[in-house]
Amino acid sequence: VSTLSGEDIERQGITTLEDFSRFVSNLNVQTTAPGQNTIVFRGVSDGGGFLVDPTAAIYLDEQAMSMTSMAPDIYPIDIARIEALSGPQSTLFGASSQTGTVRVVTNKPDMEGTEITGNMAIGVSGVSKGENGFDFDATANIPIIEDKLAARVSIFSAEDGGFIDSVAGMSVVDEYTGLGGLVSNYDPVNPHTDTVEDDINGVEWWGRRAAVKWQISDDWAATVTHNHQEIEANGFNDFDPMVGDLETVKF
């Protein structure tokens, strides 16, 4: 098991599965767009085909988060650690764990004491030849009944700056078409100006998490968790070197 603690995640500025994979041997994450990933352990993959169940799973605590054809990004706010378990994990984690599992473990409500505690973080970032970004998150731990009942709430909002430009030009569609495979996204009658834009691959994140823990007895505890996250991305992270550096033609 390879593990990164919450402190390591914050220190390294990790926000995506692809970021996390750079610190774990035998793990590769192929990202086509924010929130659309293929997890590959030891070079074994289903190929990321359409409507194909993944061979590696991602979990948030004990909840499976894998989706058909992809693994979503879980924004790492108030995280205790992220684990990468290489090799078959079907006994512990069930379906989609044939090659391995990535598990995001959150901090749980702390019932000790009677005072509300919390933290808040604000950051800014920039991308060379691209946009600026920001991130904001806040967490509060609320003891309700000492040693019996507590709640924990987190919120976040972030924006990663884009750096891929969509320009007017010619795109190769099919080398066997009568046009030689070249179709322009510029037409005097219908110029498609809506497809020409700088920094099209910017992404916005926002969401919240809430958990309530009840210590029923010395041997039994129950935790109820709500997690909501949205990702809005305007474009893919690919570009065409035949068009230009960090440029592509969309139509």
Residue ranges, per PLM feature:
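Non-catalytic regulatory/gating segments with a bias toward low-complexity or hydrophobic composition
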Residues: 9, 20-21, 82-87, 102-105, ...
